[in-house]
Amino acid sequence: MVAADRLKYLTSQVLERSFKAMASVFDPQVPAGAFDAFLSTALATSREQRTWTPDDGALPSIYLSHGAPPLFDDAPWMDQLFGWSQALPKPKAVLIVSAHWESAPLSLSASAANTPLVYDFGGFAKRYYEMTYRTPDAGELARRVASVMPDTEPVHQHVSRGLDHGAWVPLKVMYPLGDVPVLQLSMPTHDPAKLMDLGRRLRPLREEGVLVIGSGFMTHGLPFVTREMLHGAVPAWSKDFDAWASDALGRGDVDTLASYRSKAPGMPYSHPTVEHYVPMFITLGAAKHPEQPATTTIEGYMMGLSKRSFQVD
């Protein structure tokens, strides 16, 4: 087994163990019961949300910490995500780049209506594997994304690829009606400069009412999660990395953010693998002025991991 494949295998094993540990602690009497309660008011509110028009100007690009099935049992976090979405006009479509579709050629998920979901987690109650998110056809967005890519870098259409949990879990909370077309774009590299370039190509879509999302987690040291963290403790490595990122984002210091391997405290514990951090460079690249301060929309911790999320204009 080559080194890259072995790392991917070991990472998948860590994720599986971490999901099982989460499931053992986040074990509500009614799985996703908090989500059901959330829907009792969120659906009506969503129906009143105003849809984006050209007069609104470009939508922001956003980076969100996406969570996993326990998000559906975390009422405060759902309220934060939903409140964020409601503070913006309803997008005409969503294009999302998730930490969980990496090391792939530049590709788009299935664009047909009722896109299937990828249940890329293990050890949770059956309810989470029965959830659906039946979004409208995103074919028009797929064609538009392809049109902004250079001829030398074609976009592949992966007609059988559904939305992974880095996409559908937060979006099911943010847009619970499922009435916004959603398309997922793969993350073909971890290189910040290349991801910034990819984000720049997506920038025109924001002016057309498309919400561009980078989906990851501000700290994601799953191999180092302890029983104490599952019960609310926050380790120094997570706090320190989060404070460093918050400061750099507040200054619009993209160069510092891109130098996280050497400059960020709390490394490599906060990101032993970097796929949950680097989607932010899609977000920053899609910004009109990446060097402007970002606006933090969500902060705090889940399982000791920073769920900091932000938007840029």
Q: Which sequence ranges carry the predicted segments?
A:
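Beta-strand elements within well-structured catalytic alpha/beta cores of enzymes
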Residues: P60-L64, A93-S98, L185, L205-M218, ...
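N-terminal secretory signal peptides and thylakoid transit peptides that target proteins
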Residues: V2-A37
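Short, glycine/serine-rich, charged loops/turns that create anion-binding
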Residues: A68-P69, W101, T189, F217-L222
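A short aromatic-anchored loop/beta-hairpin motif
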Residues: V25-H156
